[in-house]
A protein has these predicted regions:
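Generic, low-specificity signal for short hydrophobic/alpha-helical stretches with a mild N-terminal bias
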Residues: 57-61, 94, 170, 192
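Membrane-cytosol interface segments
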Residues: 93-96, 101-102
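Charged, low-complexity intrinsically disordered regions
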Residues: 3-27, 75-82, 88, 102-240
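Alpha-helical transmembrane spans
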Residues: 13-70
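Charged, compositionally biased non-catalytic regions
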Residues: 54, 60, 65-91
Length: 240
């Protein structure tokens, strides 16, 4: 199928997917209507409701496909605009950080890689699954990874505007005391042997900058990398 998203500049993934569905509504809804009408006939005469389920699966699958293509094209456009390379799928086994230790069926998609001021940078979408049956849930995140010189102890900065990362921290981590105005927005976890050094790093000025620029993002410093994660991928937009 032709990728119509390649013809437009995508600023908002959700809006572009919605526009695509509305502009090609016949592809989505005419098969649904046909399957639904056929399903009603089969239910009335044969008592089999399976075809009704198929009609709804068609719509859900079509919407998911359109959204996925919009997300891929957004990342391709972002990569071209910043001289990055669109890689596609990535290897979870190579990743460091507490986020990548939880759940099953882990996957990295729409990976792009590049460099800025000699620092390697990667952006990608990450997902994993927890639970089973009625309790099965897929967790989705947008992730940025930046490499820097030197090594850092494993420090986690948990944004209280996003998901609770405290349950993912290492057994040897300790939550550090910070001023109440900052504690309302963030929680900081560090190895017990690096408590003083970490508090010296996260000064009030640094925490103020985090509130201005990183509210809603979880951060992790591990070895020579900084990870920034956010679970609100449904609002993934291009920002200037």
């Amino acid at each position: 199928m032709k990728n119509d998203f390649a013809l437009e500049a995508i600023e908002d993934v959700n809006q572009s997917a919605k526009n695509q569905i509305l502009s090609h509504w016949k592809i989505t809804f005419l098969p649904f209507a046909a399957l639904f009408i056929l399903g009603i006939f089969i239910v009335n005469y044969l008592g089999n409701v399976l075809i009704l389920g198929v009609s709804f699966i068609w719509v859900i699958g079509r919407i998911a496909l359109v959204y996925s293509r919009a997300k891929e094209e957004f990342m391709r456009q972002f990569a071209r605009a910043n001289n990055f390379a669109y890689i596609g799928a990535g290897l979870v086994e190579k990743m460091q950080g507490v986020l990548f230790t939880y759940g099953r069926s882990q996957s990295i998609t729409h990976l792009i890689e590049g460099a800025y001021k000699n620092h390697k940078i990667s952006f990608f979408f990450y997902s994993y699954v927890t639970g089973s049956g009625k309790h099965k849930q897929t967790h989705n995140y947008s992730v940025a990874e930046i490499e820097f010189k030197g090594n850092s102890p494993d420090i986690v900065v948990n944004s209280k505007d996003d998901w609770d990362m405290s349950s993912y921290t290492r057994p040897h981590h300790k939550q550090l005391p910070i001023e109440s105005v900052f504690a309302e927005r963030f929680a900081i976890f560090a190895p017990t042997d690096f408590e003083i050094e970490t508090l010296e790093l996260f000064t009030p000025d640094v925490l103020s900058e985090l509130i201005k620029r990183a509210t809603g993002y979880n951060l992790e410093f591990i070895n020579n990398k900084l990870l920034a994660t956010n679970s609100r991928v449904e609002k993934f937009e291009r920002t200037s």
